[in-house]
Amino acid sequence: MVKKTRPAAVPRLFGTNGVRGIVNSREMDSQFALKLGMAIGTFMKGRVMLGTDARTSNEMLKSACAAGLMATGCDVLDCGVVPTPTLQYAVRTDDAAGGVMITASHNPPEFNGIKCIDSDGTEMSRASEETIERIYAEQAFSRASWDRVGRLVPHTNVIDRYVTDIVSRVDAEAIRKAGLRVALDCGNGAGSLVSPKVLERLGVKYVTLNSNPDGAFPAHNSEPTPENTRDVVELVRAGGFDMGIVHDGDADRTVFIDETGRYLFGDRSLAILAYHMCKAKPGSLVVTNVASSRCVEDAVRMAGGRIMLTRVGSPTIARVMKEYGGVFGGEENGGLIFADFQYCRDGAMAAAKMLETVAKNGKLSKLNDEIPSYCQFKTKTPCPDEKKDAVIRRLADEAKGLKVDTTDGVKILFDDCWVIVRPSGTEPIFRIFSEAKEESKAKELAERYKKRVESLVKA
């Protein structure tokens, strides 16, 4: 009798948002980019859009990845330095087989990454990533004959088309009439090439900070956290601006500062925009993840809309929106998805929509204050990957009799607060988020469950 053997486990390359690593380490050097490009080309089989953010290592990695793609017979359309959503727009509107973005998004400058885009412009599904990982691991590359090797073709008009399409999807006349003033911080990233053009086309007066592409990120790290947005907050407070707009490195995310200098976390922006979309079209479906603030659900229900909660991750939210007809979605990190434009996070589109909302409804601080507010607390604790499932099962068992949501990890809902314990998909840790009306209660709840997780890990 022949004994069947399981296929060998394939090492995981793709994390939540592509493959990332420190430049010129084994995880992210030119040899890796070449072979991964061959694996991607073997899978995609057609015209591939290729773009980069503003990082210093982009030309090296782009050249290697492009060589790999062409070796499999794919024609590569080089879009140059563009925001990730601009590349996604190019893939979708120019009938490409897929796209490859060289970016590490908000990571520090010594990092870079490679991200794959499906033919419909959405972030690649995990199933497709697993296929590419297997091709890479087995070196099962398609190799084109000498007369079928792909070509590298410049594709330089995508930014203008993208900007024009964004402007056409908001009430530009209302924005112009409002006479808005904006402080714009592009974080020295790819958004520097797009968002100023959007503001100009909308007739917005603006002042820029850090809006020249510079892969060293000299002003601040490209993650738009409260700590990294202090300069724009001070400018808004001092300069009489209607809002501040801040992008991450590849401009798929946007956070906003209101006219008083108050930083709005992404779920506040999500709640504000969701409220006004649902008010305009009652019954609209908004999609967010189970770790988002309750303020999003409150805002949607106040406006007569419907809400659906998913696992954490923008690809999941986008696909649920597409399947169930969601009009809008997003997450706490400032990644907002507008179904009437494209099913991916889009920082420039988010900026245009918020400008339209403020122009029609009043000051951003007022819109924010109209939405119920809660206090959140976030922490994390180490856990070996092999123990994560057992810890989650135990927590779910212990919560029997309570209101529990196991969409992503374990979320336990009480009358006036909640806590979620969810395993990271890329690190050996648990993330623990809590929310309550009082900051002290949110902190106590998160710390209590952190201690419980730590005891279960040790058991």
Where are these regions (language model features)?
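Short glycine-centered, acidic/aromatic-flanked micro-motifs in structured strand/loop junctions
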Residues: 51-53, 184-186, 258, 340, ...
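Phosphate-binding and adjacent anionic-ligand microenvironments
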Residues: 243, 279-459
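Active-site nucleophile and cofactor-binding loops and adjacent substrate-binding regions
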Residues: 76-85, 263-266, 288-289, 310-311
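An N-terminal, well-structured beta->alpha segment
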Residues: 1-67, 71-73, 97, 151-182
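Gly/Ser/Thr-enriched, mixed-charge loops and adjacent short helices
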Residues: 2-9, 22, 112-239
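N-terminal small/polar loop signature for handling phosphorylated ligands or for N-terminal nucleophile
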Residues: 42, 48-111, 197-257
